[in-house]
């Protein structure tokens, strides 16, 4: 484990605020570029994800990153049962399991066209009978995408193994996709890989920023009850990963941003808790589980407002400045955002159901 030392909340917040101000003063639109992120697209993802793709294309981002939970797996997704070819039929679970991942690719990933898409693994991708090994086989094309394969071979020319965790470089930013889809993660092998990567990044002057994405949020966030804290291996390894990232900020002088989904709402500044402010500092963090899954109520400790919203669908639009600072904006999508062809295929009544009824959270006045 990398050695970590304490850094107060005010120091980290002040540093990030200062760098954000400087970026706004010194970066021109020509110096910036964008990427997009969201996760959790079961239930209504076949309707919501095409809307996300259509909105994303207007920004011309470098890529889209899905943080996991493509399909429900344990039961039929509502969008699956409302497809015309399934209407009025009694579906079998074997038929569903045999087609659910292809359904995801056909209806949720195909709308992105030639835009690079990076896939993270969620807990629903490992619900029995699904396994991590089956996931690797099914999504090998994405896990061995050109950017990932090139980076893996730069790290080790003899490494041809596909993994559910990986990283790739875009300009001066290192993007790290971690796997915490099962309760035993992060295991020793993944932690060793992660910490060695952070060590290399800290020694590399060409890396200004580290963006870490995963399905479940690291422990001790505002959304702690639905995070890596749900298992002891997750709690211990997640806290260790958090301290490793703090070390990269304090001693490596890197900018660090942490992204997760799993909770089906939008929330920013998720690590602004008493525990973390007293145990090293608060990293910038977001939850963006808003790509179609049944919406959850916000945690009791969350302050409702622009930075914490439920009963919404959308994605994060990230704008990267030349110095590596990143501005994240939540792009909220309305029912009218659904492409006409998708609304016609699923019928307006079901599209409205997705926006109005696909929720376990109370409606706000």
Where are these regions (language model features)?
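Bacterial N-terminal signal peptides that target proteins for export
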Residues: 1-11
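Bacterial N-terminal signal peptides
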Residues: 10-20
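N-terminal active-site segment of His-dependent metallophosphoesterases
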Residues: 24-95
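Residue-level marker for buried hydrophobic side chains located in beta-strands
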Residues: 35-37, 64-66, 119-120, 212, ...
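Active-site glycine-centered loops adjacent to acidic/histidine catalytic or metal-binding residues
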Residues: 40, 68-69, 122-123, 215, ...
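Extended active-site neighborhood of metal-dependent phosphoesterases/phosphodiesterases
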Residues: 78-206, 210, 228-241, 245-251, ...
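Active-site His/acidic residue clusters
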Residues: 216-234
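A short C-terminal boundary segment appended to hydrolase-like catalytic domains
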Residues: 304-365
């Amino acid at each position: 484990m990398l050695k970590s030392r304490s850094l107060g909340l005010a120091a980290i917040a002040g540093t990030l605020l200062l760098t954000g101000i400087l970026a706004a003063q010194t970066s021109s639109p020509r110096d910036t570029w964008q990427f997009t992120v969201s996760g959790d697209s079961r239930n209504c993802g076949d309707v919501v994800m095409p809307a996300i793709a259509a909105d994303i294309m207007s920004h011309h981002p470098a890529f889209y990153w899905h943080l996991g939970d493509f399909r429900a797996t344990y039961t039929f997704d509502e969008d699956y049962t409302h497809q015309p070819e399934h209407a009025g039929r009694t579906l079998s679970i074997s038929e569903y399991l045999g087609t659910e991942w292809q359904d995801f690719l056909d209806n949720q990933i195909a709308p992105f066209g030639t835009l690079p898409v990076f896939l993270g693994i969620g807990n629903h991708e490992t619900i029995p009978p699904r396994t991590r090994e089956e996931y690797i086989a099914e999504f090998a094309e994405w896990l061995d995408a050109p950017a990932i394969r090139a980076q893996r071979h730069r790290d080790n020319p003899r490494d041809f193994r596909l993994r559910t965790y990986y990283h790739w470089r875009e300009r001066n930013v290192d993007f790290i996709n971690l796997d915490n889809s099962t309760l035993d993660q992060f295991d020793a092998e993944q932690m060793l890989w992660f910490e060695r990567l952070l060590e290399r990044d800290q020694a590399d002057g060409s890396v200004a920023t580290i963006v870490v994405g995963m399905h479940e949020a690291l422990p001790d966030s505002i959304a702690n009850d639905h995070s890596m804290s749900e298992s002891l291996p997750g709690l211990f390894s997640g806290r260790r990963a958090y301290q490793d990232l703090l070390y990269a900020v304090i001693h490596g002088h890197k900018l660090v941003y942490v992204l997760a989904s799993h909770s089906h709402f939008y929330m920013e500044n998720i690590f602004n808790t008493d525990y973390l402010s007293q145990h090293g500092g608060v990293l910038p963090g977001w939850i963006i589980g808003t790509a179609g899954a049944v919406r959850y109520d916000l945690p009791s400790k969350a302050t409702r407002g622009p930075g914490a919203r439920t009963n919404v669908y959308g994605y994060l639009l990230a704008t990267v400045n030349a110095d590596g600072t990143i501005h994240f904006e939540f792009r909220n999508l309305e029912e009218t955002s659904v492409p006409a062809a998708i609304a016609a295929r699923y019928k307006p009544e079901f599209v409205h159901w997705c926006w109005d009824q696909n929720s376990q959270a109370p409606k706000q006045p």
